[in-house]
């Protein structure tokens, strides 16, 4: 508040020296009451002072309002608004008076949405702002007076914007009658005439309106609040006029607009126009409708005039409607809309400037007949729209279409009456350009003009405006109907245009973009952006909203193309716009608009009519022409800035569309991942496909495949495709100026810029999550690993998601591969290690391998028991843990036998798969009394199959049903064997058999890399875990000692722990093989410590396990791990020499160590660890996606170093290991 700070100090709650002691309670009460009363009196005094201050402020505000109103009236009379007749002036005066009478209400209603603007009121404005405002007002006044007076005559002579001024002068007598046309406000004609005069300089006329509007849209918001009058819409409207001079600096010339904005310091409007980041800028520009018209008249020749217009327009949007200033009042509501409506837009709309001039010559008739939009600009706010239109993508074009076309558009988009169609179409088209609120204003204006939906629209507008203006607006709209339908029909369209321009601000989506724009564009000095946008959505949303949004996007694209010319980054938006074209097709349901856009420059009235409403909603169909011919310089420039910032600011209507803010809404998952990732999904995604097609056809973007949807370069893809579409078909087809092609290229760069933040951001997180999987070369294995992981634990589930998503990312985000590979290695390892029932997934993934593996194991098991220990035990455990966790009941018998294995599954769970489980079970069954080497070999192979499959069966039932059917069949066999095993269990012989098997694991290793990895890895790990044999032995021994049940209970517990930790353990085991080996044997080890000792002693001959300590085991394990990773990885696709040839060699080489130890206990636990490592490595290598370095130190190391996810997993695994290792140790 401006009030001076008042401090209320309690005078004396208690007198310092009370006359008498406070002996009684009543004395204290009296004293307290007295002090309280004193304080209340003091407060009352302060309140009175505040009220007086407020009264003074209100009086000053009223005075300012009156002066502003008078100024506005004078300005209106000066403006070249033929649409505004004396009636309109009177109406506006009446509206202003009513506004003054309702000053308080208006102020309140305004203050709600203008609250931010109020900050700039004289009371709260910073000195710098005050100076700017003063300068702006002076500039506006001088510019409006001098330029409008001078150019007024000039316009008549030259037929430029000031011709509109002439018209405005004529209508001045009847401004009230055209109050309904306020939307078309005469300013539009002024602008349009200005544009017409500048038709030769396409950039000047359209850019003028664009610049002014853009500038106004952005800055006017601030200005509206800055000016004391802005509180009331009327006052604001006049302020807009006065501010126009300031905004005038926002040149109308297409590209100069930026320069003008910067040079002139056109307040926020200029900067906003320069920096299209803010949707507000566009809106503000749009806002300058009425003033724009004035300014354009005066500004026809000079950018200053245009800026003035823009400023006026901006201010006016704040409260223009309340004043009902001129025919713009309708527009006035959306002051920015008027700006949009300015002839510049129309002029650009009518691609040929000459036609525009021609229309300008006979402003009312010519404009109307030529194209509703243009006729409107010429008659109403031609200059304003012109100025704005250029900058606002293609609004002018759309509106430029003939009234008939406009009508059809209007009917289609807004479903308004065709009779009002001419002006309506403009409005419809305007909404595409204008953000939602702009569209709403257009609707309101058009409806009154058309009379069909005038009541509803004006009401809505009024409600949204929250201003007394609304009633005036309705009246204006009503009178505007005649105006719109007659020569003013063009004016009405002009209004639409002006609205269209603001829509351009929110071109992306009527609903989505509008809100974003309103929010993002603080330019909502007038709440209309949001509220009106909502209105617009309501009114036109059903018909127009989507189409408009789509068209807006298209329009944005078109403009973006131009902007691309100016700046490479804008092309990004252009891309979105192009994508919008596809989006338009789906939403608008009119593919022609895209194609027609080039054709339906303002020149093609038909196209505009049929294509204008929707494409213009996007603003692109019209814009390309408008942009290239007139507004290319300015509009391109302005839009470029807008698009540039658009990447950052998603809420820019066009920018945001291009950026993908709105696009997300439309095409969240349409075609391009980047579209998805980026906020431009809705607009860009739908168009994304089209843009891709276009891209393929035109390959607009320089380093990107045109047809590529490239998730990582979604924007770039969008940019490529959309840009070509807009620039080639629209710009080249309709208006083939060099700017179109130029735009396309710059657009692509912008798109790329936008891409990294949107698509890259989105992708990177997702990619990271699924880094390992995406890199995985074989999705099946990866997925199976993921599935297994899910079985094993929570981590598994996460991995699964990663796997699925990762696969997508792998395909989608090849650009991100560098990152993904790093993560993939560690992640893949973690995945493999994690998968508890890896064998199961492996079966699914490599069912043939599994089928083969059992046979191979059996075959090999008979001749060579070596294979069994390495991988066989671990996978069964892994499956078992899932089985135990998921189906404890189904695995009871097996548990006894599997319990020993249970410790191992965590290690072998990675992808020891069937072979490992079989081997593991084979090992368990080997203990059968029958011949350990040979007899056991068959028994083992059978038992292992059953064992492996039993755990698999339970796990497969839980996780994959059907994959493990055979194992279940074996499970029955396993039952007896398991029982036999406890009896037969001579763990020593079993261990020996395991060693032998581990030494000769060719069958299993030969299995698919993942499957083999477990066997070989366990074999290698057996050597590593030679000191650990007890752990695996302990599980086996546990079966013996516990005979199933005890082991089952303990094993189940341990398995439960391991199952939970198996995914972790897998990665951890690689990190610390000993730990993993210890883990499996924690409970089992305790259960079977004696037998483990025996086993170890017996296996010592093969391995130096007997005297090994835990540290020794760790050392051995790590060493063996390195060997496995080092040896087998380089030699084999399956790291760890899973292949039968590598496997046998490695197993044989390491079998001396691992056979006895691994067979005893390390065989199961260490082998499982090694198997996991090998499996993991095999998976990594198999998934050639991430060619795993053959010389990997260890999965754990890789995980720790490369993947944060892996690091997390390792940490968890380490915890599990510690838990298990401590007990086992």
Swiss-Prot record:
Bias kind Acidic residues: ranges: 841-851
Biased composition (Basic and acidic residues): 852-867, 1082-1093
Biased composition (Low complexity): 675-688, 1156-1166
Any one Gene Ontology BP term: cell differentiation
Biased composition (Basic residues): 552-568
Positions of post-translational Phosphoserine modification: 500, 576, 691, 1054
Region (Disordered): 161-180, 193-213, 291-371, 466-510, 543-632, 670-766, 812-1009, 1042-1093, 1128-1203
Organism domain of life: Eukaryota
Keywords noted in UniProt: Phosphoprotein
Residue stretches of biased makeup (Polar residues): 291-315, 339-350, 710-730, 812-827, 939-968, 1054-1065, 1138-1155
Keyword Phosphoprotein: yes
UniProt xrefs under PANTHER family: NANCE-HORAN SYNDROME PROTEIN, NHS-LIKE PROTEIN 2
Family: Belongs to the NHS family.
Protein name per Swiss-Prot or TrEMBL: NHS-like protein 2
Protein species of origin: Homo sapiens
Gene: NHSL2
């Amino acid at each position: 508040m401006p009030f001076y700070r008042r401090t209320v100090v309690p005078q004396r709650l208690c007198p310092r020296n009370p006359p008498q002691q406070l002996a009684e309670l009543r004395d204290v009460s009296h004293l307290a009451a007295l002090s309280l009363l004193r304080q209340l009196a003091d407060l009352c005094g302060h309140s009175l002072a505040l009220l007086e201050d407020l009264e003074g402020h209100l009086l000053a505000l009223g005075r300012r309002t009156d002066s502003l109103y008078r100024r506005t009236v004078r300005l209106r009379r000066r403006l070249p608004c033929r649409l505004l007749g004396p009636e309109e002036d009177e109406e506006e005066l009446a509206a202003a008076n009513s506004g003054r009478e309702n000053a308080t209400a208006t102020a309140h209603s305004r203050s709600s949405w203008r609250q931010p603007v109020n900050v700039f009121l004289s009371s709260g404005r910073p000195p710098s702002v005050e100076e700017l405002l003063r300068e702006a007002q002076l500039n506006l006044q001088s510019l409006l007076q001098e330029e409008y007076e001078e150019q007024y005559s000039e316009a008549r002579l030259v037929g430029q914007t000031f011709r509109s001024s002439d018209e405005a002068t004529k209508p001045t007598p009847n401004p009230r009658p055209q109050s309904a046309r306020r939307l078309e406000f005469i300013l539009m004609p002024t602008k349009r005439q200005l544009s017409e005069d500048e038709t030769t300089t396409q950039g000047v006329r359209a850019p003028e309106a664009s610049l002014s509007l853009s500038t106004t849209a952005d800055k006017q918001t601030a200005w509206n609040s800055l000016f004391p009058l802005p509180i009331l819409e009327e006052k604001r409207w006049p302020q807009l006029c006065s501010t126009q001079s300031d905004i005038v600096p926002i040149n109308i010339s297409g590209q100069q607009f930026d320069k003008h904005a910067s040079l002139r310091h056109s307040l926020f409007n200029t900067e906003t126009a320069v920096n299209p980041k803010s949707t507000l800028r566009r809106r503000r520009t749009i806002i300058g409708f009425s003033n724009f018209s004035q300014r354009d008249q005066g500004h026809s020749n000079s950018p200053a005039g245009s800026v003035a217009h823009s400023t006026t327009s901006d201010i006016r949007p704040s409260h223009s409607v309340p004043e009902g200033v001129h025919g713009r009042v309708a527009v006035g509501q959306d002051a920015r809309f008027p700006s949009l409506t300015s002839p510049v837009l129309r002029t650009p709309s009518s691609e040929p400037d000459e036609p525009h001039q021609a229309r300008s010559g006979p402003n009312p008739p010519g404009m109307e007949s030529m194209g509703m939009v243009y006729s409107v600009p010429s008659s109403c706010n031609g200059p304003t729209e012109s100025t704005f239109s250029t900058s606002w993508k293609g609004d002018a074009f759309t509106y430029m279409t003939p009234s008939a076309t406009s009508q059809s558009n209007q009917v289609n988009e807004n479903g308004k009456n065709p009779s009002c169609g001419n002006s309506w179409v403009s409005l419809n088209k305007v909404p595409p350009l204008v953000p939602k609120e702009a569209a709403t204003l257009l609707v309101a204006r058009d409806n009154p003009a058309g009379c069909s939906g005038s009541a509803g629209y004006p009401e809505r507008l009024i409600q949204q405006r929250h201003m007394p203006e609304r009633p005036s607006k309705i009246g204006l709209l009503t009178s505007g109907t005649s105006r719109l339908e007659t020569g003013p029909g063009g004016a009405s369209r002009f209004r639409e245009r002006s609205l269209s321009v603001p829509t351009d601000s929110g071109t992306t989506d009527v609903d989505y973009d509008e809100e974003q724009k309103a929010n993002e564009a603080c330019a909502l000095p007038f709440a209309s952006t949001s509220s009106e946008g909502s209105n617009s959505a309501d009114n036109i949303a059903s018909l127009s909203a989507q189409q408009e949004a789509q068209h807006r996007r298209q329009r944005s694209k078109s403009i973006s193309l131009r902007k691309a010319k100016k700046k490479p980054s804008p092309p990004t938006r252009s891309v979105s716009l192009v994508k919008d074209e596809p989006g338009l097709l789906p939403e608008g349901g009119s593919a022609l608009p895209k194609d027609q856009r080039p054709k339906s420059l303002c020149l093609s009235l038909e196209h505009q009519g049929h294509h204008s409403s929707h494409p213009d909603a996007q603003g692109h169909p019209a814009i390309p022409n408008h942009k290239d011919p007139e507004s290319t310089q300015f509009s391109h420039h302005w839009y470029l800035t807008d698009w540039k910032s658009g990447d950052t600011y998603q809420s820019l209507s066009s920018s945001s569309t291009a950026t993908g803010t709105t696009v997300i809404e439309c095409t969240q998952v349409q075609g391009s991942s980047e579209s998805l990732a980026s906020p431009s999904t809705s607009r860009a995604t739908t168009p994304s496909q089209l843009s891709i097609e276009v891209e393929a056809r035109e390959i607009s973007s320089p380093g990107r495949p045109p047809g590529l949807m490239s998730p990582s370069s979604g924007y770039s893809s969008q940019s490529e495709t959309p840009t070509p579409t807009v620039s080639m078909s629209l710009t080249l087809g309709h208006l083939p100026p060099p700017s179109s092609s130029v735009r396309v290229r710059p657009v692509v760069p912008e798109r790329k810029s936008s891409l990294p933040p949107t698509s890259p951001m989105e992708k990177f997180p997702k990619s990271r999550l699924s880094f390992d999987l995406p890199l995985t070369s074989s999705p099946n294995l990866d997925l199976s690993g993921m599935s297994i992981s899910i079985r094993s634990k929570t981590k598994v589930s996460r991995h699964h998601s990663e796997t699925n998503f990762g696969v997508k990312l792998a395909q989608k985000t090849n650009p991100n591969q560098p990152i993904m590979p790093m993560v993939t290695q560690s992640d893949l390892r973690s995945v493999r290690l994690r998968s508890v029932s890896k064998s199961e997934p492996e079966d699914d993934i490599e069912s043939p391998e599994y089928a083969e593996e059992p046979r191979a194991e059996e075959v090999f098991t008979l001749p060579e028991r070596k294979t069994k220990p390495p991988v066989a035990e671990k996978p069964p455990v892994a499956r078992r843990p899932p089985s135990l966790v998921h189906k404890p009941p189904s695995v009871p018998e097996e548990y006894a036998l599997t319990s020993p294995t249970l410790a191992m599954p965590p290690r072998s769970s990675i992808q020891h798969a069937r072979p490992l489980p079989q081997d593991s079970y084979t090992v368990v069954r080997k203990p059968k009394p029958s011949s350990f080497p040979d007899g056991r070999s068959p028994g083992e192979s059978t038992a292992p199959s059953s064992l492996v499959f039993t755990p698999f069966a339970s796990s497969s039932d839980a996780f994959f049903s059907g994959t493990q059917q055979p194992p279940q069949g074996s499970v029955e066999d396993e039952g007896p064997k398991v029982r036999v095993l406890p009896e037969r269990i001579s763990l020593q012989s079993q261990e020996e058999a395991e060693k032998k098997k581990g030494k000769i694991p060719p069958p299993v290793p030969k299995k698919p890399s993942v499957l083999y990895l477990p066997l070989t890895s366990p074999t290698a790990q057996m050597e590593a875990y030679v000191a650990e044999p007890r752990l695996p032995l302990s599980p086996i021994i546990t079966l013996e000692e516990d005979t199933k049940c005890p082991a089952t209970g303990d094993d189940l517990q341990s398995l439960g722990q391991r199952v939970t930790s198996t995914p972790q353990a897998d990665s951890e085991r690689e990190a610390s093989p000993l730990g993993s080996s210890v883990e499996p044997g924690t409970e089992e080890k305790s259960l079977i410590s004696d037998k483990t000792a025996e086993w170890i002693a017996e296996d010592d001959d093969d391995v130096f396990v007997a005297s090994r300590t835990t540290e020794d085991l760790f050392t051995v394990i790590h060493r063996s791990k390195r060997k496995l990773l080092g040896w087998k990885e380089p030699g084999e696709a399956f790291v760890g020499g899973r292949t039968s040839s590598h496997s046998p060699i490695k197993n044989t080489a390491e079998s001396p160590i691992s056979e006895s130890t691994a067979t005893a206990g390390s065989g199961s636990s260490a082998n499982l660890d090694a198997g996991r490592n090998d499996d993991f490595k095999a998976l990594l290598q198999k998934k050639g996606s991430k060619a795993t370095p053959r010389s990997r130190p260890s999965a754990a190391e890789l995980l720790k170093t490369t993947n944060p996810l892996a690091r997390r997993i390792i940490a968890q695994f380490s915890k599990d290991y510690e838990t298990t290792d401590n007990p086992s140790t």
